[in-house]
From Swiss-Prot:
The gene is eno. It comes from Gemmatimonas aurantiaca (strain DSM 14586 / JCM 11422 / NBRC 100505 / T-27). SUPFAM superfamilies: Enolase C-terminal domain-like, Enolase N-terminal domain-like. Catalyzes the reversible conversion of 2-phosphoglycerate (2-PG) into phosphoenolpyruvate (PEP). It is essential for the degradation of carbohydrates via glycolysis. Binds a second Mg(2+) ion via substrate during catalysis. HAMAP family: Enolase (MF_00318). It catalyses: (2R)-2-phosphoglycerate = phosphoenolpyruvate + H2O. Its cofactor is Mg(2+). This is Enolase. Keywords: Cytoplasm, Glycolysis, Lyase, Magnesium, Metal-binding, Secreted. It holds the Pfam family Enolase_N. Mg(2+) binds at residues 242, 286, 313. Belongs to the enolase family.
Amino acid sequence: MASIVAVSAREILDSRGNPTVEVDVVLETGAAGRAAVPSGASTGEREAVELRDGDPARYGGKGVLNAVNNVNTEIAEALEDMDATDQIAVDRALLDLDGTENKGRLGANAMLGVSMAVARAAAFEVGLPLYRYLGGPMARTLPVPMMNILNGGAHATNTVDFQEFMIIPVGADSFADGLRMGTQVFHQLKKVLVSRKLSTGVGDEGGFAPNLASDEEALKVIIEAIEAAGFRPGQDIALALDVAASELFQNGQYHFKKSGAPSRSPKDMAEMYAGWLEQYPIVSIEDGMSENDWDGWKLLTEKIGDRCQLVGDDLFCTNSEILAKGIENDVANAILIKVNQIGTLTETFEAIELARSAGYNSVISHRSGETEDTFIADLAVATQAGQIKTGAPSRSDRVAKYNQLLRIEEQLEGYAEYPGGAIFGI
């Protein structure tokens, strides 16, 4: 048995310079695993609790020493001598120890760090790559990257309301080819912005963060960059949006405070998206309505759900119970998977399996506050989700995931599959 003999944690910094939790797990054989926990900027109300210290004298109250202490004491004691290869039992022990619905006692950041580090240690123990250990022998589907090359919303201090404008290399033959295509468009976008005397500073996720006249203007400059790179919009490169509409929703209306655009009703929003689908090669819209606007979500799904992937992020929070409600009510048709929204790997896999059984797509995702940890790259292949969001091909915290996927594709040699546009029905 691969018994756990040591569990320890420390406070490290994420890509925004905020503290986060890193965990080490050591087994009796000497096998070890390490994992670092990401953190979001725009967070859903129903996400598991990220435990912060609240001491204004340290990191503006964002320290995580209490979460670290929970790992080093209660959690370490509870997991001693447990079998690291029994992930479900380990995660169940964590859930039982916390004893709350939202993981507010121990902290989802403490629990997730342990859950991921245990999986890494177990993979090392049995001599398998992490993606193979988690996914089994059939794990060979590389994800199509959704590359956030223009940032707005809570991820940037500009005049763009929508949080992410992404490009998707649907016409690529492999992950490596898709990454190349997306990167070439990213560099062309910089040239387009320079030609317009716009800022080429980047946001939290590595995408450019210029001040633009409107959210639609972002689509136009990206189309220009795609064509300048020698690609065909819609055939080679498609578009995706993360509206993060919960950040815009107040008193039944969507307010565009950054750009100063007129407020819109849920019906207006749905009609706007439908119009954009006619004008631009958009194949995916994430959080197009607020997490608290289920009627708006229903309207949106009925209006464009047959021809566009509609992803619930804040809506579902990687939570199987909330996802089940969405499935029952025919709301959205895909779920964003963020491991720190739910707090354990077991619950993450449960959400993915529920989505798959209902015909919903899953998109594995980073957070805006990331680390150099590449766990989600392996997770994307292990679950055969077929899609990943991990930012622009810029900033080491984002590129680390892309580079890990390149390594995995190389390891799989001729067995790797890249779904391309097929995952969107194109």
